[in-house]
A protein has these predicted regions:
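N-terminal secretion-targeting helices of virulence/extracellular proteins
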Residues: 1-132
Length: 132
């Protein structure tokens, strides 16, 4: 198939976990520099720089969360399309079974010429089959 929703969701979970780790690292960076006890302009500069880096880390964590959300949406869409393909395959199969059982020989030749796409193929989305 064109994507494994379970694997995609696993990647999304990994990104969310990394986002949490990055946020934790940002918090630890600020806490360590605040706890250093360095006074004066040098200490102030260190703390300012650490807060800037922590902000950058939090932005990176947010981007990880955004990527994870995009992967979740993609996994949902893959699930939806796989169900749609399965439904179309089933309808086409039922139609072919009914048609072969009930139609004259001349139509059977036409039916024999229909070559369904492979199971799970995205080409099933192009097949038009009436609902039964």
């Amino acid at each position: 198939m064109y994507g494994d929703p379970t694997a995609i969701r696993r990647l999304a979970a990994g990104l969310r976990e990394q986002a949490g780790e990055i946020r934790g690292e940002a918090d630890r960076l600020v806490a360590r520099t605040d706890a250093a006890g360095w006074l004066g302009r040098g200490g102030d500069a260190l703390r300012d720089r650490a807060r800037e880096r922590a902000l950058d880390l939090r932005r990176a964590a947010t981007l990880h969360d955004d990527a994870a959300e995009a992967l979740e949406r993609h996994a949902h869409e893959v699930d939806r399309l796989q169900r749609l393909i399965e439904e179309i395959e089933g309808r086409a199969g039922r139609l072919l079974d009914v048609a072969r059982d009930r139609l004259d020989d001349w139509v059977s030749g036409w039916l024999d010429a229909f070559h369904p796409p492979p199971r799970g193929s995205v080409r099933w989305l192009e097949v038009e089959v009436p609902r039964w």
